[in-house]
Amino acid sequence: MVTIRLARHGAKKRPFYQIVVADSRNAATGRFIEKVGFFNPTAKGQEEGLRLDLDRVNHWVGQGASVSDRVAKLVKDAQKAA
């Protein structure tokens, strides 16, 4: 099953997440099909905290991909901001 989920990157105590489309059987930070955005929960000031390609997310959801709980909230926030 294809899932849209977060893949953690960054240093210790400085998380940075890529929003990826991946097969649910692969490791969380392993192989992915497509990168559709990023999320920086520690963004301050003028730094960009969230970038999401909503067209590609909607494409994958239309193809039957499931969305993780956290990514669903981020998509909702991005749609509200757009």
Swiss-Prot record:
GO cellular component terms, semicolon-separated: cytoplasm; small ribosomal subunit
Its BP terms in the Gene Ontology are: translation
Q: Got any disulfides in this one, which pairs?
A: none
Please provide the record's keywords in A-Z order.
Ribonucleoprotein, Ribosomal protein
Domain of life (superkingdom): Bacteria
Q: Which Pfam families match?
A: Ribosomal_S16
Q: From the UniProt record, which GO molecular function terms apply?
A: structural constituent of ribosome
Q: Which family does it belong to?
A: Belongs to the bacterial ribosomal protein bS16 family.
Q: Which NCBIfam families match?
A: S16 (TIGR00002)
Tell me what this protein is called.
Small ribosomal subunit protein bS16
